Amino acid sequence: MGKLIRCISEDGTLTVMAADTTDIVNRAQEIHGTSAVVSAALGRLLTAASLMGSALKGADDSVTLRINGNGPAGTVLAASDSHGNVRGYAVNSVVELPLNDKGKLDVSGAVGKDGFLTVIKDLGLKEPYVGQVQIVSGEIAEDITNYFATSEQIPTVCALGVLVNPDLTIRKAGGFIIQLLPTADDTIIDKVEKCISDIDPVTTMLDKGLSPETICRTVLPAFKLDMLDTSEPEYRCNCSRERVSRALISMGRDELEKLKDDEKTEVCCQFCDKKYVFTPADIDRLLEESKGKEDK
């Protein structure tokens, strides 16, 4: 279970949220068997999605982040509900790359830079909001910052990090997002820049035992902060046999007829690796169900 906190400055000029997502990213690594660099990429995206999801107002709202820079990891995707509960995957869960020139895991090399970050917000309207920006670095935090500046016109500071142990378990993972509110002027921007000019990486702060609340106060020492809310997000998949059945029906009757010829049809959830098995009799029932819908 993760820990997430959201704060607002007393002067009403900015918000800051921070999260410890170590348990969440560990769970993702267990499910997908990710290599170190893919754990770092997926973990950063899961953390960003959790933070962004927690800021959604509607109980049933959700946000999905998808990044594909034509790197060896392929598409990396993370989705969050409005409580910050997340799930995600990378198309290629095992990628081995040398460390980058800073001696760190080469997330940019795994993700690639030739592509887009897509943000899909389902706010319960007729159509979801979709924003898309070109990848800036493939390091993910910079790409999230660029998304907010370009698509939502919100000045943002985003920091994300994942520390991977030699045995591929996750030592620490987390991040923070600072966002200026419309009341902020140039002096506030200067104040924020001064605050963050010499801070430790977020994983270093977590490794020192700092809580998300302490991280918020550490990165913005010049601001008095009021806590908005706290939550304990987790890695949570919402797949079910009913959802998988609906997905199979949506393929159309012709495809279902083909599946009926197989001894069994196995569908595996990309997010949690749970397997759903459908026998020819199950497919028959789905065909009947789809016929009933067509007759209405």
Specify the residue positions occupied by each region the protein language model found.
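Cys/His-clustered metal-coordination modules, chiefly Zn-binding fingers
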Residues: 197, 201-296
